[in-house]
Amino acid sequence: MKPSTKTNVLKDSADNLHDQSIIDTARKVLNIESQAIAELGNRIDDQFVNVVHHLNQCKHLVVTGVGKSGLIGKKISSTFSSIGLPSLFLHASEASHGDLGMISEGDTVIAISNSGETEEIVKLLPVFNRIQCTLVGMTGNMESSLAKQSDYVLDVSVKEE
């Protein structure tokens, strides 16, 4: 068997960096992240309060997304389950292949898409409406299809990723 020819990009990059540049980069990333959190905090408004009240009455929660939004959705779903709100994650790409049966009338769906135009999410919007579930959109684009078709919308936009 041949030895792997893959290179460890992180290791190779770190070997070529000076200790101070590593520290500077880490601090820069943390500053960007903390700024984004502070800005998000400034956007908490009545819509957020309405979502909290709705979730407090919710019997079953489904969280959906694709890619990084999907990974975030998995964590959100897990956290809600941990605090006693029955929740599951539905991968938007898998939904149309038999998984839509997980959603029933009266359920709440949190759909996460930074653009609000993710194809897999947009295709599900009419289905959510037909099932008559409550839709909470989390998006960085308040003019998107997701924002316009959600019962509640949370602005999760960021300046820099």
Language model regions located:
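N-terminal acidic, proline/glycine-rich, low-complexity intrinsically disordered segments
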Residues: M1-V9
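Short, motif-level signal for alpha-helix interfacial/capping segments enriched in acidic residues
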Residues: V9-D15, R130
